[in-house]
Amino acid sequence: MNRRFIFLFFIVAFVGLLPFRSPAPLIYAPGEGWYYEPAGSNAKWTRTRAKDQLEVAEEAFKNQDYSTTLHAAYRVLKVWPLSDYAPRAQYLVGRCLEMEHRDEAAFDKYQDLLKKYPRTDSYDEILWRQYEIANRFYGGQFFRIFWGYLPLYTSMDETAKMYGKIVNNGPYSDVAPHAQLQIGAAREKDKDYEAAVKAYETAADRYHNQPVIAADAMYRWAITYQKQSTKAEYDQGKAGQAIAAYTDFITVFPDDKRVAAAQQAITMLKAEQVRGSFVVAQFYENSKTLSATQRRNGAIVYYNEVLQLNPNSPYAAQARQRIEALKPLLQNPPAS
């Protein structure tokens, strides 16, 4: 143990043993975390009536003193939770947390407000505020830990759940159709295409009387099926579903500006169906696990599908050649 360490040890011990007054300036408040408050300073913002306490919170918020706003608003909620002033206090808590960029905590406080005080006059505004918060997370904002202070990760799953809460809070509110679409967008961004399709389907069905929303839902529904089809080379069902979805979109919204793009997508998907069937036919023909008869039968089925889908495709000639080569082998299989 060197002399420097011994010296530091005695300094720390000396300071620790000094008598001093500790008015416990560090205080923890649920939702706020730890904050510093010198002894006696709370007299500046505490009041004995809910109305007066809320006025302190309002004035502090107006002056961008969010720390005092939170203290005063939380006091209203703690001391007078059933008063007429509690909903506004809860609202101010959410607003302060937003201003401090603690969006996840703000969202939760707004959620608590809607559950505890469902008749609040700010209901629609709060839904829109929740929507804007969710949009920020959709745009890549990080979720935080340690009472909302440390940004750590992005999550489209948690973002989609936020949009889901907004829809559940008011399924037929003005913001709900947009939030429902965003559930699909978040799931799509997360490459959870099955969940995305379901979300878009819900939007198109529930808000069918809102043409802008319904059209957007149907179009994005078709796009999501198309994305699935590119990842399912041996399952041409997704391409067929995408074609059907685009066709429905064109039928229901023939004047939509995206019809031309939908028609082009259908053409591409049909070409992809042909290519996919050809790939599956080759898979059967070259399989090492199937019997010779199974390989030839399977290959012929899918080569025929290539011709049925488009007899003039770039794959058609080769498909015909392979059918002509395989059929005689089925009738007269070579001796094993």
Indicate residue ranges for each PLM-predicted region.
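Acidic, polar-rich low-complexity tracts and alpha-helical solenoid repeat scaffolds
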Residues: 20-336
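Bacterial N-terminal signal peptides that target proteins for export
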Residues: 1-9
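Bacterial N-terminal signal peptides
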Residues: 8-17
